[in-house]
């Protein structure tokens, strides 16, 4: 069973599904759904449409130049059937898929990290501004007074420098 890739969006096309478009110069284009076929005929750029793999790669949301993707490349050479070899490839495919999901998770974590840092800084700034709502004015008056004095001193220094 050969699983093809859609020419437009790169999603898998299983046997008995999809549309084939053959141009006059005998190049074959395979599409997974009518949406991809229509957009191809309208000469739309797949990198500019958000649902395609090309667009996801361009925006950094998919793995690029990963060794696990080399194994998905199409090979047109027929291979003689050997049971042991096919069992090894099935085992390798399982380990590769596990590795691929792990790497994809790491990619997502790396992409989210800067946003989390910014969010944390914003929350800390909000806490500093609204400290009077968090801490009761009667409790720990010395700490509040010293902080207030320090803030006044900072504002006075900044005014002097300007």
Swiss-Prot record:
It is found in: Nucleus, Nucleolus. GO terms for cellular component: nucleolus. The keyword Nucleus applies. InterPro entries: L24e/L24_sf, Ribosomal_eL24, Ribosomal_eL24-rel_N, Ribosomal_eL24_CS, TRASH_dom. GO terms for biological process: ribosomal large subunit biogenesis. GO terms for molecular function: structural constituent of ribosome. Keywords: Nucleus, Ribosome biogenesis. Belongs to the eukaryotic ribosomal protein eL24 family. Involved in the biogenesis of the 60S ribosomal subunit. Ensures the docking of NOG1 to pre-60S particles. Associated with nucleolar and cytoplasmic pre-60S particles. At the end of biogenesis it dissociates from cytoplasmic pre-60S particles and is likely to be exchanged for its ribosomal homologue, RPL24. This is Probable ribosome biogenesis protein RLP24. The gene is rsl-24D1.
């Amino acid at each position: 069973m050969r699983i093809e890739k859609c020419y437009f969006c790169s999603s898998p096309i299983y046997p008995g599904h999809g549309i084939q478009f053959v141009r006059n110069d005998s190049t074959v284009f395979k599409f997974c759904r009518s949406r991809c076929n229509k957009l191809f005929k309208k000469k739309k750029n797949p990198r500019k449409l958000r649902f395609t793999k090309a667009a996801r790669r361009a925006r950094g949301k998919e793995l690029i130049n990963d060794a696990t993707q080399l194994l998905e490349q199409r090979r047109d050479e027929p291979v003689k059937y050997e049971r042991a070899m096919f069992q090894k490839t099935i085992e390798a495919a399982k380990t590769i898929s596990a590795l691929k999901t792990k790497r994809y998770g790491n990619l997502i974590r790396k992409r989210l990290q800067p946003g989390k840092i910014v969010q944390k800084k914003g929350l800390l700034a909000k806490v500093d501004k609204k400290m009077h709502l968090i801490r009761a004015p009667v409790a720990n008056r010395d700490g509040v007074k010293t902080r207030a004095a320090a803030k006044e001193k900072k504002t006075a220094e900044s005014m002097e420098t300007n």
